[in-house]
C-alpha cells in the first residue's frame, strides 16, 4: 500500500545518505 511505498522511499533515501557519508 501507500505506507509501504513511503517506507521504501525513506529506506532508499537513508541508504543514499549513509553511502554518501561513507564515501
Swiss-Prot record:
Main location per the UniProt record: secreted
Tissue spec: Expressed by the skin parotoid and/or rostral glands.
Gene Ontology cellular-component annotations: extracellular region
Coiled-coil region(s): none
Domain of life: Eukaryota
GO biological process terms held by the UniProt record: defense response to bacterium
Subcellular location: Secreted
Keyword DNA-binding: no
Keywords: Amphibian defense peptide, Antibiotic, Antimicrobial, Secreted
Signal peptide boundaries: none
Family from the record: Belongs to the frog skin active peptide (FSAP) family. Caerin subfamily.
Role: Antibacterial peptide, that adopts an alpha helical conformation which can disrupt bacterial membranes. Each caerin displays a different antimicrobial specificity.
Protein name: Caerin-4.2
Organism: Ranoidea caerulea (Green tree frog)
Amino acid at each position: 500500500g501507500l505506507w509501504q511505498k513511503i517506507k521504501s522511499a525513506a529506506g532508499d533515501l537513508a541508504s543514499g545518505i549513509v553511502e554518501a557519508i561513507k564515501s
